[in-house]
């Protein structure tokens, strides 16, 4: 049975459900076909980046978040998620930079707290 645009929408929605159900690897598998058919789909790439992060696949998560930010440099969530990825990978200076960009783009309390504007970048204070 050939894949159709509807199939990809169904796979995307199913991947969202799998990620919510804590099955990030299953989500990645579904999203691989969606992204193969629609490589420009930023929403699918962002969801796959989140799934990679949830599966502790930090390098693939980093690459996907960076690709999203190349296309949408004002995406505060992508900056925040990339910062969390860097933080988890033990790269505090890069994490702080993206936490601060996220907070500057969208002053959500969670972003502002993570940005730690009152401390030096990467100091962990």
Protein language model features and the residues they cover:
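Alpha-helical segment of the N-proximal tetratricopeptide repeat
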Residues: 6-40, 54
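Structural marker of alpha-solenoid helical repeat scaffolds
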Residues: 3, 37, 71, 88, ...
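Terminal, low-structured helical/coil segments at or just beyond the last alpha-helical repeat
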Residues: 4, 8, 96-125
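Structural signature of tandem alpha-helical TPR/SEL1-like repeats
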Residues: 21-29, 33, 55-67, 89-101
């Amino acid at each position: 049975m050939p894949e159709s645009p509807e199939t990809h929408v169904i796979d995307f929605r199913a991947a969202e459900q799998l990620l919510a159900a804590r099955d990030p690897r299953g989500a990645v598998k579904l999203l691989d076909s969606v992204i193969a058919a629609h490589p420009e789909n930023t929403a699918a790439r962002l969801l796959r980046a989140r799934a990679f992060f949830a599966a502790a696949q930090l390098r693939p998560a980093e690459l996907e978040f960076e690709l999203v930010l190349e296309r949408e440099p004002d995406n505060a969530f992508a900056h925040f998620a990339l910062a969390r990825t860097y933080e988890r990978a033990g790269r505090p200076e890069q994490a702080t930079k993206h936490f601060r960009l996220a907070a500057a783009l969208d002053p959500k309390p969670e972003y502002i707290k993570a940005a730690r504007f009152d401390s030096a970048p990467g100091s962990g204070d």
